[in-house]
Amino acid sequence: MTTPYKHEPFTNFQDQNNVEAFKKALATVSEYLGKDYPLVINGERVETEAKIVSINPADKEEVVGRVSKASQEHAEQAIQAAAKAFEEWRYTSPEERAAVLFRAAAKVRRRKHEFSALLVKEAGKPWNEADADTAEAIDFMEYYARQMIELAKGKPVNSREGEKNQYVYTPTGVTVVIPPWNFLFAIMAGTTVAPIVTGNTVVLKPASATPVIAAKFVEVLEESGLPKGVVNFVPGSGAEVGDYLVDHPKTSLITFTGSREVGTRIFERAAKVQPGQQHLKRVIAEMGGKDTVVVDEDADIELAAQSIFTSAFGFAGQKCSAGSRAVVHEKVYDQVLERVIEITESKVTAKPDSADVYMGPVIDQGSYDKIMSYIEIGKQEGRLVSGGTGDDSKGYFIKPTIFADLDPKARLMQEEIFGPVVAFCKVSDFDEALEVANNTEYGLTGAVITNNRKHIERAKQEFHVGNLYFNRNCTGAIVGYHPFGGFKMSGTDSKAGGPDYLALHMQAKTISEMF
């Protein structure tokens, strides 16, 4: 009998005891920086000459780890190992599979600060963001374990006299997991354990920018009793290894989180039936957003400003849920803009060595260059009112940047930047606000700051996003509380951390017995 699910509490860094504990965790992680990590194929460690070098984006001189780089030959071995392991793992009871997740969650919880400290080093996350990332990883394991125990019963269907009908779920097969670097622990862990607990086997190709946390998590799964071959760890390039895994005829399911460009490419490649393939592949994809915070004319100014700031600049705007657009009613536009500038300029952007750092670096040189190029575009399209500068001499640091007076069709209002840049757009009424909010190809998250009940009810119907929030920021979805996934080009609306998610990894089977 399991206890009811509750999300993992966040660490209070106002408590000096927690600060000291986290400093110790950072020291612990520092002791194993630069370590080599092998591939894991069928439970065996495989060292390769080629390496993926993970560096600290806040300190380019600091190597977090060197991870063996897989070739197509390794990818083939991993697929075969997963296919072989599937024949036994699929028949392991759901309760036993769930028990692996419960044990893994407990192990991560006991080392929570250590894992969070690794996220600070590998992704440049501020302490509170790293802590939330680790908490979410724990949540995915706890939530999906409980969900699988419930789904093991199947769903009720009708039976006529003289027959017994059942509707049950069965595993799908080999799952290729391609997670992102931004939620390097939470999404990587969640998309790995969901197929595992549903009876599938996994080939995990982690993000090349952040492979060390994935290697550490695979160790946790093995220590938690996961049999060999159920998870296989093959870091490698998307072009060489990623495409090979997606195209493979033994791949049944692909779960991907990342850019629209890569996601649509995977969707297209997965649709092609390869020689020897005996099934249609499924794709679970989350592909980003261009998310909007709408501020109504009667909004609380402080709440609106805090919501915009948090949505835009948490983890340097490197979230698919980031509120990179502020659509504000003309009556309160100047007040809200001024207050967001004040809040932003009061915060610390630096190497995340202490709890008071609000924003750290962006992930790498490519991201830095892309974001800085968008800032130049913004200078042509709007009015730069804060930030706009960067420094990549020691790490990849960009000041939180605010542009005002953007046209709704401007590039800064339409294209995903994935950095600390927010664009303000003035509207004359709520009709126009909703029109602008819906005018992109994405539909992931959104927020409305208002005290108008009619406008709230209308936005529920007409603001077309997968995750809609009122009178709060549009980031920070919690597993089991705010199932996460978007519409349109934001993905397949596969709600991670929700009651429907595990079923996407399984096949429904109808069984009818006469007696």
From Swiss-Prot:
SUPFAM superfamilies: ALDH-like (SSF53720). GO terms for cellular component: cytoplasmic side of plasma membrane. GO terms for molecular function: 1-pyrroline-5-carboxylate dehydrogenase activity; proline dehydrogenase activity. Belongs to the aldehyde dehydrogenase family. RocA subfamily. The active site is at 286, 320. PROSITE patterns: ALDEHYDE_DEHYDR_CYS, ALDEHYDE_DEHYDR_GLU. Important for the use of proline as a sole carbon and energy source or a sole nitrogen source. Disruption phenotype: Deletion of the putBCP operon abolishes L-proline utilization. Keywords: NAD, Oxidoreductase. This is 1-pyrroline-5-carboxylate dehydrogenase 2. Induction: The expression of the putBCP operon is induced in a PutR-dependent fashion by very low concentrations of L-proline in the growth medium. CodY represses the operon by displacing PutR from DNA. Its EC number is 1.2.1.88. It comes from the Bacteria. It catalyses: L-glutamate 5-semialdehyde + NAD(+) + H2O = L-glutamate + NADH + 2 H(+). Pathway: Amino-acid degradation; L-proline degradation into L-glutamate; L-glutamate from L-proline: step 2/2. NCBIfam families: D1pyr5carbox2 (TIGR01237), PRK03137.1 (NF002852). GO terms for biological process: glutamate biosynthetic process; proline catabolic process to glutamate. It comes from Bacillus subtilis (strain 168). Pfam families: Aldedh. It is an enzyme of class 1 (oxidoreductase). HAMAP family: RocA.
